[in-house]
A protein has these predicted regions:
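Non-catalytic cap/lid and distal C-terminal segments of serine-dependent acyl enzymes
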Residues: 1-221
């Protein structure tokens, strides 16, 4: 759906020290049958997939909690189908997941699937979750951009409209933003909308925090 080769970053939990010292199977990973929960991580505008690994302790979290994480580049396209060879929505929902489930035996559609994003990636995480509620087990959106000015709402809808479509369902969404964030105004308005429409989802507002990895790292721990 992107018409080109792309790079991803994938973290799979390894054997812990006890397992490694007591395991003599040279094909341990080939024989391992455990299915890990999978987290798809979406970066912000102007950033790339490596930001997650460079700015957070996500690798150690994967090891400690036994879950896998995959990070992709957003290429400033908001994780939407902006075509003709920039169909990032279909890439994530079809190409990426098919590749992961088809090539790594410890990843399976039967295991829990989550999507997490920061800033532009927060928008993407919400959009993908709300349009695929049956597929995802949860969504984390940190400092999400909730109303991009140049998104064609007649084509993609608004996040508000997608929340209203799904409000009767048991939504598992975590929203968080710092009170010093430059998009705090629209975020407060969005939170008011969520409360007034009884969506069952509300923001966590964090005093002193801004729009940065320093804040986002603390939120994912």
């Amino acid at each position: 759906h992107l018409g080109r080769r792309v790079e991803i970053s994938l973290i799979l939990p390894s054997a812990n020290l006890h397992e490694a010292l007591n395991n003599h199977d040279k094909e341990y990973y080939q024989h391992r049958t455990e299915h890990f929960p999978l987290v798809i991580g979406l970066c912000g505008f102007g950033d790339n997939r490596k930001a997650w690994i460079n700015n957070t302790t996500i690798e150690s979290l994967c090891e400690k909690n036994h879950f896998a994480a995959c990070f992709i580049n957003g290429e400033n396209k908001w994780y939407l189908n902006l075509g003709p060879i920039d169909n990032h929505y279909d890439f994530l929902e079809e190409d990426l997941l098919d590749y992961l489930y088809g090539n790594f035996k410890n990843l399976s559609p039967e295991a829990p699937l989550f999507v997490i994003g920061v800033s532009m990636g927060g928008y993407g995480a919400l959009y993908h979750y709300l349009t695929n509620v049956e597929k995802y087990d949860g969504c984390v959106a940190l400092s999400p951009a909730t109303k991009p000015d140049f998104i064609d709402e007649s084509k993609f809808g608004t996040l508000q409209s997608h929340f209203l479509k799904q409000k009767e369902k048991d939504l598992h969404v975590f929203l968080s933003i710092g009170e010093k964030d430059f998009i705090i105004g629209p975020s407060r308005e969005f939170n008011t909308f969520l409360k007034e429409n009884h969506v069952g989802v509300e923001y966590r507002f964090v005093p002193g925090a801004d729009h940065s990895w320093t804040f986002w790292e603390k939120e994912i721990i």
